[in-house]
């Protein structure tokens, strides 16, 4: 056991133990992996009484998550899972913590997953969902986009796609433990391998193969680390220091800052991949959710207040 592991709180030790069990049978077929992930979330996480859930099927599938904290802004959220696992239902509880902190309605999109639907299907779905939210009357200045892991990469793919099409950009964006380099060239892929309880290079490679089906992993919409990031809205990046995707986040922050993007980078000591999932009992999970809420309100408050003024 490392010194870092020896100093973990009981709550954090519980997180590591729980994450280790999710994909413990890495030789399973995709259907079994999906079922295991959904069962993990169903068994361990539950919505608070003040959370309202509204299912949407057309024009895009997903769940609206709303809490009693308010609904003055909209957050379009892309779940993680290597573009192959995860769902809006699995991420509903995590989304509710963010919704409460940001005083926002959160729409968790069920984008088409690989390998049944390869790149660029997820990006196309993200564009459709964003346009739908704006066409429903939302002021883009009060809209936020965000996601975790693969969803963090999808967030950046959406932003660069909107910019290149000269479409309205959201007020800000949030990337949690983002996966933005599908070639896995970051030093932490190897350097943090003994610390990360969930992800492995081999596992990420399998997800990349499913998503790409032989396509070039360096395409900017696949690996936004290689994208032109100029002109994007303020960006919050959160990452744990014990995850193999640490360098994805650090390099993204460096390149976005160099491109003139206002970047807030927050590293959480000893946190594993997407620790926010455990906000119900992990203090750092609640802290990270509250940090997202503060960031969102900082960058959308003026527009949200203006929209509430009588006309």
Predicted regions and their residues:
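A glycine/proline-hinged amphipathic helix-loop "lid/cap" segment
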Residues: 1-70, 301-311
């Amino acid at each position: 056991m490392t010194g870092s592991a020896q100093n973990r709180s009981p709550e954090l030790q519980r997180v590591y133990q729980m994450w280790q069990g999710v994909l413990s049978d890495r030789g399973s077929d995709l259907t079994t992996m999906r079922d295991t992930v959904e069962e993990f979330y169903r068994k361990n996480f539950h919505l608070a009484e003040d959370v309202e859930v509204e299912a949407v099927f057309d024009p895009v599938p997903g769940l609206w998550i709303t809490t009693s904290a308010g609904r003055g802004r909209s957050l379009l959220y892309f779940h993680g899972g290597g573009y192959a696992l995860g769902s809006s239902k699995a991420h509903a509880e995590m989304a509710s913590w963010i919704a409460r902190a940001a005083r926002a309605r959160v729409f968790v999109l069920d984008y088409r997953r690989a390998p049944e639907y390869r790149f660029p299907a997820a990006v196309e779905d993200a564009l459709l969902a964003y346009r739908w939210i704006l066409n429903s009357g939302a002021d883009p200045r009060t809209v936020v986009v965000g996601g975790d892991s693969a969803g963090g990469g999808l967030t950046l793919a959406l932003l660069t796609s909107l910019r290149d099409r000269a479409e309205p950009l959201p007020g800000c964006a949030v990337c949690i433990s983002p996966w933005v380099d599908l070639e896995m060239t970051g030093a932490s892929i190897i350097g943090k391998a003994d610390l990360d309880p969930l992800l492995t290079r081999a596992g990420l490679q399998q997800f990349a193969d499913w998503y790409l089906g032989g396509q070039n992993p360096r395409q900017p919409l696949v690996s936004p680390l290689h994208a032109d990031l100029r002109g994007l809205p303020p960006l919050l990046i959160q990452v744990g220091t014990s995850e193999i995707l640490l360098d994805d986040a650090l390099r993204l922050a460096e390149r976005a800052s160099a491109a003139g993007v206002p970047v807030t980078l927050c590293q959480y000591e000893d946190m594993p991949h997407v620790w926010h999932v455990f906000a119900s009992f992990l203090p750092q999970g609640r802290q990270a959710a509250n940090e997202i809420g503060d960031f969102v309100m900082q960058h959308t408050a003026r527009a949200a207040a203006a929209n509430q003024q009588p006309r």
